[in-house]
Curated annotation (Swiss-Prot):
<dbReference type="GO" id="GO:0003677">
    <property type="term" value="F:DNA binding"/>
</dbReference>
<dbReference type="GO" id="GO:0043657">
    <property type="term" value="C:host cell"/>
</dbReference>
<feature type="region of interest" description="Nuclear localization signals">
    <location>
        <begin position="6"/>
        <end position="47"/>
    </location>
</feature>
<comment type="subunit">
    <text>Homomultimer (Potential). Interacts with Rep; this interaction relocates Rep into the nucleus.</text>
</comment>
<comment type="similarity">
    <text>Belongs to the gyrovirus capsid protein family.</text>
</comment>
<keyword id="KW-1164">Virus endocytosis by host</keyword>
<keyword id="KW-1163">Viral penetration into host nucleus</keyword>
<keyword id="KW-1048">Host nucleus</keyword>
<dbReference type="GO" id="GO:0075732">
    <property type="term" value="P:viral penetration into host nucleus"/>
</dbReference>
<dbReference type="GO" id="GO:0019062">
    <property type="term" value="P:virion attachment to host cell"/>
</dbReference>
<dbReference type="GO" id="GO:0042025">
    <property type="term" value="C:host cell nucleus"/>
</dbReference>
<dbReference type="GO" id="GO:0039615">
    <property type="term" value="C:T=1 icosahedral viral capsid"/>
</dbReference>
<keyword id="KW-0426">Late protein</keyword>
<dbReference type="InterPro" id="IPR007291">
    <property type="entry name" value="Capsid_protein"/>
</dbReference>
<keyword id="KW-1162">Viral penetration into host cytoplasm</keyword>
<keyword id="KW-0945">Host-virus interaction</keyword>
<keyword id="KW-0238">DNA-binding</keyword>
Length: 449
C-alpha cells in the first residue's frame, strides 16, 4: 500500500513510483464545490521533452554503522569572461573575441569542498589569480614560510572555464574545520580531501536547492533560463588525447584550462567562456575547384577552443527551462527567482551510497581518490544556465554575447545563485570502540606470566 500524507486545507498525497502524487479531490475552500481544473497535465507535458529524473529503482542495501551530516550554504556569482593578452599576437585577436553568457553548475562533493575553501588563496572569489598568495610570510623560498607557499610568479596566463563555478562562490560548510587553513593553505587536491574525511568510507547526496536571479539587463528582453538535469545531460567528446579524466574529459594544464598557470602563452591559452570562430584543425581538402571563395581555416594554434559543451538559451527553453527576468523588466519578488531542488543520488539503479575512501586504504593518495576507486567527483545533478536576448548571433540561438575585456578591479555578474546543500558521510568500517577495548584487554593474554 502506498504511503500517504496529509497537509493543511485538506490536501492528501500518496507516494507511488518514486514521487509524491497529489490526490485529485474536490476543493473545499469555497462554499460550493468546484471541480479541480486539469491544467493539461503540465508535469506530463514537460517530462515528454525533458525528464530530470528518468526513473527510480530502490535497492535494499545495508545502512552505515555511523553517519555525519554536512551542510553547505552560500552564493554563486555567474560572471562574464575576461581576457589577459600578454603579447602582440593575443592582443590582435583580443578585439575580435566574444563570449557567451552560459554557465554550468555541477552538484558533486568535490566542487562543493572547493567552493568552501579559503577566501585568501589562488583563484577563489573573483576568478583566477596569476600566482599563489602567501598565507603567512614573505620569503622567496617556500620552506621559509608557513604554510609553505610560493610568491606570485610573473608572466603567467591564468584561465578557467564557466564550469568552474566554485571559483566565484562564497560557500560556508557546517561542521567547520578549524585546522583547514593551516593544513591545506593551497587548493585542496583529491588526496587532501581524502585525508580530511579519512575516517569515513561512504557518502551520499541528500538535497540541494538552487535559487537563481537574473541581475543584468541585455536589451529589452533578457531572461535567464535554467534547467536542472540528472547527471551530465550533454556528453562531452571522448578523445583519447584528452580523456585522462573519466568524467570531465580534460587534462590538467591542457585544453580546456582548469585554472592552471604556465610561463608560455602557447602552452596554456585562456579560454574562459570563449567560443572558437570555427573548429580547430579542420580536415584538409586536397582537391580544389575554380568556383567559390577561398577560406582560410584556423588550426589548433590559432583558435582558442574548449571541449566543454553548454546549452544555448533556445535549447534550454525548448527543454522546458524556467525563466528569471532581471530587475527592470519585472518587479522583484519570490517569483523572480528560478527555484530548483535536487534530491537523492538521481540514479535509476538505486545506488544510494557512494565510495568516499576505498576500504583497506592505509595511505591515502591521489590514485586511491581518483575514479573508479573513489566517487568523490561524481556528478549527481547539473544546472545549466544561459541568458537570452532579442539581439544575438544566429548560431548562438538567442544566447546573449559580449566582447571580452581586460580584467578590472570588479566582476560583472549577470546572475546570482543561492545554494543550500545537504550531504551525509557514512562508515561501515570496523572496529567499533568496544571492539578496540576488547582487543586491548585480550591481546596479550598469552604473554602474561
Amino acid at each position: 500500500m502506498a504511503r500517504r500524507a496529509r497537509r493543511p486545507r485538506g490536501r492528501f498525497y500518496a507516494f507511488r513510483r518514486g514521487r509524491w502524487h497529489h490526490l485529485k479531490r474536490l476543493r473545499r475552500r469555497y462554499k460550493f464545490r468546484h471541480r479541480r481544473r486539469q491544467r493539461y497535465r503540465r508535469r506530463a507535458f514537460r517530462k515528454a521533452f525533458h525528464n530530470p529524473r528518468p526513473g527510480t529503482y530502490s535497492v535494499r542495501l545495508p545502512n552505515p554503522q555511523s553517519t555525519m551530516t554536512i551542510r553547505f550554504q552560500g552564493v554563486i556569482f555567474l560572471t562574464e569572461g575576461l581576457i589577459l593578452p600578454k603579447n602582440s599576437t593575443a592582443g590582435g585577436y583580443a578585439d575580435h573575441m566574444y563570449g557567451a553568457r552560459v554557465a554550468k553548475i555541477s552538484v558533486n562533493l568535490k566542487e562543493f569542498l572547493l567552493a568552501s575553501m579559503n577566501l585568501t588563496y589562488v583563484s577563489k572569489i573573483g576568478g583566477p589569480i596569476a600566482g599563489e598568495l602567501i598565507a603567512d610570510g614573505s620569503k622567496s623560498q617556500a620552506a621559509e614560510n608557513w604554510p609553505n607557499c610560493w610568491l606570485p610568479l610573473d608572466n603567467n596566463m591564468p584561465s578557467a572555464t564557466p564550469s568552474a563555478w566554485w571559483r566565484w562562490a562564497l560557500m560556508m560548510m557546517q561542521p567547520t574545520d578549524s585546522c583547514r587553513f593551516f593544513n591545506h593553505p593551497k587548493q585542496m587536491t583529491l588526496q587532501d580531501m581524502g585525508r580530511m574525511f579519512g575516517g569515513w568510507h561512504l557518502f551520499r547526496h541528500i538535497e540541494t536547492r538552487f535559487q537563481l536571479l537574473a541581475t543584468k539587463n541585455e536589451g529589452s528582453f533578457s531572461p535567464v533560463a535554467s534547467l536542472l538535469s540528472q547527471g551530465e545531460y550533454l556528453t562531452r567528446r571522448d578523445d583519447v588525447k584528452y580523456s585522462s579524466d573519466h568524467q570531465n574529459r580534460w587534462r590538467k594544464g591542457g585544453q580546456p584550462m582548469t585554472g592552471g598557470i604556465a610561463y608560455a602563452t602557447g602552452k596554456m591559452r585562456p579560454d574562459e567562456q570563449q567560443y572558437p570562430a570555427m573548429p580547430p584543425d579542420p580536415p584538409i581538402i586536397t582537391t580544389t575547384t575554380a568556383q567559390g571563395t577561398q577560406v582560410r581555416c584556423m588550426n589548433s594554434t590559432q583558435a582558442w577552443w574548449s571541449w566543454d559543451t553548454y546549452m544555448s538559451f533556445a535549447t534550454l527553453t525548448a527543454l522546458g527551462a524556467q525563466w528569471s527576468f532581471p530587475p527592470g523588466q519585472r518587479s522583484v519578488s519570490r517569483r523572480s527567482f528560478n527555484h530548483h531542488k535536487a534530491r537523492g543520488a538521481g540514479d535509476p539503479k538505486g545506488q544510494r551510497w557512494h565510495t568516499l575512501v576505498p576500504l583497506g586504504t592505509e595511505t591515502i593518495t591521489d590514485s586511491y581518490m581518483s575514479a573508479p576507486a573513489s566517487e568523490l567527483d561524481t556528478n549527481f545533478f547539473t544546472l545549466y544556465v544561459a541568458q537570452g536576448t532579442n539581439k544575438s548571433q544566429q548560431y548562438k540561438f538567442g544566447t546573449a554575447t559580449y566582447a571580452l575585456k581586460e580584467p578590472v578591479m570588479k566582476s560583472d555578474a549577470w546572475a546570482v545563485v543561492r545554494v543550500q546543500s545537504v550531504w551525509q558521510l557514512g562508515n561501515r568500517q570496523r572496529p567499533y570502540p568496544w571492539d578496540v577495548n576488547w582487543a586491548n584487554s585480550t591481546m596479550y593474554w598469552e604473554t602474561q606470566p
